[in-house]
Swiss-Prot record:
Domain bZIP: 299-357
Lineage, broadest ranks: Eukaryota, Metazoa, Chordata, Craniata, Vertebrata
Start and end residues of each stretch annotated as Disordered: 20-43
Species: Mus musculus
Biased composition (Basic and acidic residues): 25-39
Family the entry assigns: Belongs to the bZIP family.
Induction comment from the UniProt entry of this chain: Isoform 11 is expressed in a circadian manner in the adrenal gland with an expression peak at ZT20 (at protein level). It is induced by cAMP in an immediate-early fashion and can repress its own production via a negative autoregulatory mechanism.
Key words of the record: Activator, Biological rhythms, Cytoplasm, DNA-binding, Nucleus, Phosphoprotein, Repressor, Transcription, Transcription regulation, Ubl conjugation
Name recorded for this polypeptide: cAMP-responsive element modulator
Residues carrying Phosphoserine: S116, S142, S284, S287, S290
Start and end residues of each stretch annotated as Basic motif: 300-325
Length: 357
């Protein structure tokens, strides 16, 4: 046999061997897929499992790398060509998540607990309603002492608004002055003053906040509509100081309100300086300052700062002088020691010079 014949014979043998291996692998893959399909149908609960009537495997291909074609005949009589692809099975990486079961149980409240809560709320309301008011306690304590001003109780909303009051509702705080006047302060900052002869809050007159052209710093201007006979009154006002202005007529005499001490007590008197008619100023030692007082305060602070600076400079100069004196004394000591060392050096030279000769 020639060499060409041997080569052809070997090639045909190799092709047959490769085709047989491909067909065997395709048969294995088909049987595996059929088994998996049947097992899946059995797991899902299907009773009838479709079976393949005929599976014929035919290998076609001329080259070594050409894929093989598988003919699969279905029960309905159809023939399907399936191109075999050999794949190595990979283990599944998907892991089933761990599910934690949480049981939620709702506990219904019993009727006893609900009844106890209702009873507790009723008791709390009764205790709060039985408590005496702060003004009632003060009135009971100050009823025996004539010097302490009496604090009037507030009128309830059921009694209605007094007929003489047209610009505000029932006041929240009512005070009685030493001369018998009633002063009412509402939540919005409105002040009302009644005459001594009026009953309760009847005859209260409104004091409204206004703005003037150039008010002093820290002052507040209000409208004043009442006037006493003697011209001197004292009343207690919680909060900031006020400036009182006559509301009835522009020709009425003006008044000045001055606060003395830490207690907010104001004395109304005639002004000594030329002020606009009907306008008065309220001055307080702690909060209101005139421009002259502000200038004096600034001058005093400046002088105090200069005095502190002078004292600090004097102390600095004194320390510098002490340091210079200390340095001078050290220089003097070093000069004396230097002279002694020079003398000792000369004596040593004199002693050593004859020996060398």
């Amino acid at each position: 046999m020639s060499k060409c014949g041997r080569k052809k014979y070997m090639r045909t043998n190799v092709r047959q061997m490769t085709m047989e291996t491909v067909e065997s692998q395709q048969d294995r893959s088909v049987t595996r897929s059929v088994a998996e399909h049947s097992s899946a149908h059995m797991q899902t609960g299907q009773i009838s499992v479709p079976t393949l009537a005929q599976v014929s495997v035919a290998g076609s291909g001329t080259g070594r790398g050409s894929p093989a074609v598988t003919l699969v005949q279905l029960p309905s009589g159809q023939t399907v060509q399936v191109q075999g692809v050999i794949q190595t099975p990979h283990p599944s990486v998907i892991q089933s998540p761990q599910i934690q079961t949480v049981q939620v149980a709702t506990i219904a409240e019993t009727d006893d607990s609900a009844d106890s809560e209702v009873i507790d709320s009723h008791k709390r309301r009764e205790i709060l309603s039985r408590r005496p008011s702060y003004r009632k306690i003060l009135n009971e304590l100050s009823s025996d002492v004539p010097g302490i001003p009496k604090i009037e109780e507030e009128k309830s909303e059921e009694e209605g608004t007094p007929p003489n009051i047209a610009t505000m509702a029932v006041p929240t705080s009512i005070y009685q002055t030493s001369t018998g006047q009633y002063i009412a302060i509402a939540q919005g900052g409105t002040i009302q003053i009644s005459n001594p002869g009026s009953d309760g809050v009847q005859g209260l007159q409104a004091l409204t906040m206004t703005n003037s052209g150039a008010p002093p710093p820290g002052a507040t201007i209000v409208q004043y509509a009442a006037q006493s006979a003697d011209g001197t009154q004292q009343f207690f006002v919680p909060g900031s100081q006020v400036v009182v202005q006559d509301e009835e007529t522009d020709l009425a005499p003006s008044h000045m309100a001055a606060a003395t001490g830490d207690m907010p007590t104001y004395q109304i008197r005639a002004p000594t300086t030329a002020l606009p008619q009907g306008v008065v100023m309220a001055a307080s030692p702690g909060s209101l300052h005139s421009p002259q007082q502000l200038a004096e305060e600034a001058t005093r602070k400046r002088e105090l700062r200069l005095m502190k600076n002078r004292e600090a400079a004097k102390e600095c100069r004194r320390r510098k002088k002490e340091y210079v004196k200390c340095l001078e004394s050290r220089v003097a000591v070093l000069e004396v020691q230097n002279k002694k060392l020079i003398e000792e050096l000369e004596t040593l030279k004199d002693i050593c010079s004859p020996k060398t000769d």
